Amino acid sequence: MEEGQLMLASLLRREVRDAKDREVGHLEDLAFDLAARPPVATDIAVHLEWTDRVGELLLPRPVEDIVLLLPWSEVEALEPEAVYLRHEHPRFEVSSSEGKLLLRRDVLNKQMVDAEGNRLQRVDAVILKREGVLLFLEGLQVGMEWFPAGKRMERLVGKLRRRYNRAGEANVIPYEAIVRVDEEALVIRT
């Protein structure tokens, strides 16, 4: 893996701490804007251990096991041991997940197809690039050694990496090849 790159899986379940350095939960997912070039993280899904408030709203009773989507502007720092938020619990700004692309939910392990609907393979890993506190989508990692179609996939990935002038790992499809993410499949430009 190239310097500055990391896998989505390495961030999932990472501890999340508020502005007072209290553990409030863990990272559950990341929302990305695929229209941006390169695609950038827009929101962070945090699995809270418990809360009696959502933003400024007081709940009728405390709840456990709730996932809130917070805008990326809430992220103060990304450290190896934790994600640090700008505000203290429970004073977070909250976003709706409606219309958002969440990498864990919508991309990881999703079936990839070409524009004609031919099945290619599943997404094995999502590769991100970190620049300061920002995260960008680099590409989609695919395994090529376990499947009979491995050589065909290897040729396809090589072709895509040359098309988008991307050096690096031979088994990573560049983000530029992603056409769209549908409910049932991720469409790749071949």
List each language-model region with its residue ranges.
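Peripheral interaction segments used for macromolecular assembly
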Residues: 1-190
